[in-house]
Structure formats: structure tokens, C-alpha cells
């Protein structure tokens, strides 16, 4: 199994709901280690650039508006198969279709305000991590977890 890094975002609805800690806790419990974290508010240009692949989609303008509507938490998560593992922990894009026990099933409001972002491939993860975090802001460490 490969150790990977992936980009995770706690979206404005997750920050507003006061569940930053709960979400990070789920990642830690499930073997994904935060190796970079920053709370920030995205500019329109940052959100448009980040979601450029969705530019032609009908929901693009609304998505950019939502993603810039309040603070977000940007994170790099590290672990075995981190990209796919993060997507499993998040659940499906539409919370109505998300499996029980996933973040989106438990916390999301709707298909847009769905609480978390996660990179969808190893290749995109590299691009997305470097979009927000220069390498010097990512700090690897070993876990010595309590039993
Ligand atoms: P993800 O990879 O599971 O986050 O989903 P996508 O990459 O397909 O879409 C990016 C984000 O756009 C989603 O997480 C939602 O916030 C939003 N989104 C996706 N589909 C829709 C839609 O049909 N309507 C609206 N309003 N937003 C959507
Ligand atoms: Mg996506």
C-alpha cells in the first residue's frame, strides 16, 4: 500500500456547524494524519481557480459563491491510500446517496453544502495540495497514539 497525500477542505457549512474538531477526529481515527492545516477565507479568484474543472457546469457560479461565503479549513491528509480512503470517509457528493457513517451522510446539508472536499485522484491530489500548500508548510511526523 502506498503512502499518499490528499487535499481535504472543510467547507463553509462545516465550519459554521462547529464540527471542525469532529471532522478532523474522524480522519485521525481512520488513519489519515493531518500534516498541514490552515483556516482561511478563499477569494473568488482562488475558488474559481481551484474548481476550474467545473467551469462549464451549471452550478459553478453558485459553488464559487458558497465556497467564498465564509472561512474554510484547508488540510493535507497523509496515510495509506489517502486519496481513496478520504473519499470513502467523506461519502458520496449527494448526502442523500452517501453511505451510513460517512461525513456527508452525517453532517451535509445538501449536494452543494456537503461539508467536505477531497481530491479525486492521486494526480489531482498533487495539483490540489500544491495549489494551497508550498512543501515547506507540510510537516510529516510519526504517530504515537494512545492505546
Ligand atoms: P465531489 O468531488 O464529491 O466534491 O463532487 P464534484 O467534484 O462533482 O463537485 C464539486 C462540488 O460541486 C461538490 O462537492 C458540490 O459542493 C458541488 N456540486 C456538485 N454537483 C452539484 C449539483 O448538482 N448542484 C450544486 N448546486 N452543486 C453541486
Ligand atoms: Mg470533485
UniProtKB/Swiss-Prot annotation:
Places the protein is found: Cytoplasm
Example of a GO cellular component annotation carried by this entry: cytoplasm
Give the catalysed reaction(s), semicolon-separated. a 2'-deoxyribonucleoside 5'-diphosphate + ATP = a 2'-deoxyribonucleoside 5'-triphosphate + ADP; a ribonucleoside 5'-diphosphate + ATP = a ribonucleoside 5'-triphosphate + ADP
Pfam families named in the record:
NDK
- Cofactor(s) in the UniProt record: Mg(2+)
Which CDD domains does this chain map to? NDPk_I
The positions annotated for binding ATP are 11, 59, 87, 93, 104, 114
* EC numbers, comma separated: 2.7.4.6
SUPFAM superfamilies (alphabetical)? Nucleoside diphosphate kinase, NDK
Molecular-function GO terms, alphabetical:
ATP binding; metal ion binding; nucleoside diphosphate kinase activity
Gene Ontology biological-process annotations: CTP biosynthetic process; GTP biosynthetic process; UTP biosynthetic process
Q: Which UniProt keywords are present, listed alphabetically?
A: ATP-binding, Cytoplasm, Kinase, Magnesium, Metal-binding, Nucleotide metabolism, Nucleotide-binding, Phosphoprotein, Transferase
Q: Which residues form the active site?
A: 117 (pros-phosphohistidine intermediate)
Instruction: Name the major location.
Output: cytoplasm
Q: Which family does it belong to?
A: Belongs to the NDK family.
Q: How does it assemble?
A: Homotetramer.
Q: What does this protein do?
A: Major role in the synthesis of nucleoside triphosphates other than ATP. The ATP gamma phosphate is transferred to the NDP beta phosphate via a ping-pong mechanism, using a phosphorylated active-site intermediate.
Q: What is this protein called?
A: Nucleoside diphosphate kinase
Q: What organism does the record attribute this protein to? A: Anaeromyxobacter dehalogenans (strain 2CP-C)
Q: What is the lineage of its organism?
A: Bacteria, Pseudomonadati, Myxococcota, Myxococcia, Myxococcales
